UniProtKB/Swiss-Prot annotation:
Full protein name: Protein PB1-F2
Subcellular location: Host nucleus; Host cytoplasm, Host cytosol
One Gene Ontology term from the biological process aspect of the record: symbiont-mediated suppression of host cytoplasmic pattern recognition receptor signaling pathway via inhibition of MAVS activity
CC per GO annotation: host cell cytosol; host cell nucleus; membrane
Additional record remark: Is not encoded in all strains, and seems to be dispensable for replication.
Amino acid sequence: MGQGQGTPWIQSTGHISTQKEEDGQKIPKLEHRNSTRLMGHYQKTMNQVAMPKQIVY
């Protein structure tokens, strides 16, 4: 199950990055700060879920 979850997570992170760049211009700074907090949360979760072998791209 851990390996299966890893793939979607990576794809989701990529999607979020793309949206952040596009929406970042229109969205206020307040929203931008929220996005940064979300990104930090995702990174923490990925560190816990993703295993050293998975990190290798």
